């Protein structure tokens, strides 16, 4: 094919291959796979990670795709307004964001109002008691914003805590439900796609009690 005959995704793949031919010590990739079809993207990410590791090429990848950053990066820097807001390994960036800005940027959960009721517990008007390990100490009675991520709540049809289903997205191995509380908070929840009872919009969705979160992140 001539250059004008190839797609944007093909052009990106060709550019990526050329950049690796010289086996540089340092490689800067700016949105390297943004135009690649999703069907090829994950396959290329796996191959790219293996090549970079084998050739020991230090690589800085600029991307807006957090999943891409989490998979390819040993370390992740969250940059907002020209400043590094957090620099850590991918696990900590996701599970222990250090600011509301980082939470909003990652868009992988919701902040809900809660009150600290004990050393390992807090209370939310809609969800009731939530228990877990605080990563930062807050005095009893403190009003906080609790980070609730999609994997923090468990589905239980027999529970008396019911939330309204607003939306359901199929993601292969999982469904992502969007649930509405009595105070109109919209909470995302993961459910395995093999679960027997899949809920439709406007149905009630049971949340397992007691709610236990491994690590409680508050602001």
Please place each PLM-identified region on the residue numbering.
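ABC ATPase nucleotide-binding domains
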Residues: 1-101
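Short glycine-rich loop/turn motifs that provide flexible caps or phosphate-binding loops at active sites
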Residues: 7-8, 106, 113, 171
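Small-residue-enriched segments and motifs
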Residues: 46, 100, 114, 163-164
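Secondary-structure boundary/capping residues
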Residues: 57-60, 111, 174
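C-terminal boundary and immediately downstream tail of ABC-type ATPase nucleotide-binding domains
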Residues: 95-117, 147
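Non-catalytic connector elements of ABC transporters
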Residues: 109, 120-219
């Amino acid at each position: 094919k001539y250059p004008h005959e190839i797609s944007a995704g093909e052009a990106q793949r060709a550019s990526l291959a050329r950049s690796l031919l010289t086996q540089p010590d340092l490689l800067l990739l700016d949105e390297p796979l943004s135009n690649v079809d999703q069907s090829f993207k994950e396959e290329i990410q796996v191959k790219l990670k293996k090549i970079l590791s084998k050739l020991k090429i230090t690589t800085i990848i600029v991307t807006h795709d957090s999943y891409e950053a989490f998979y390819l990066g040993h370390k992740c820097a969250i940059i907002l307004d020209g400043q590094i807001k957090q620099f850590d390994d991918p696990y900590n960036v996701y599970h222990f964001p250090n600011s509301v800005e980082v939470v909003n940027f990652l868009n992988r959960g919701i902040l809900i109002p809660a009150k600290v009721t004990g050393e390992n517990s807090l209370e939310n008007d809609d969800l009731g008691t939530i228990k877990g390990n605080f990563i930062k100490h807050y005095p009893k009675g403190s009003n906080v914003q609790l980070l609730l991520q999609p994997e923090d709540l468990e589905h239980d049809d027999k529970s008396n805590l019911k939330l309204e289903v607003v939306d359901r997205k199929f993601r292969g191995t999982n469904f992502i439900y969007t649930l509405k509380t009595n105070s109109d908070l919209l909470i995302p929840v993961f459910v395995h796609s093999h679960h027997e009872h899949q809920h439709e919009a406007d149905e009630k969705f049971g949340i397992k009690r007691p709610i236990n979160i491994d690590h409680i992140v508050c602001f």
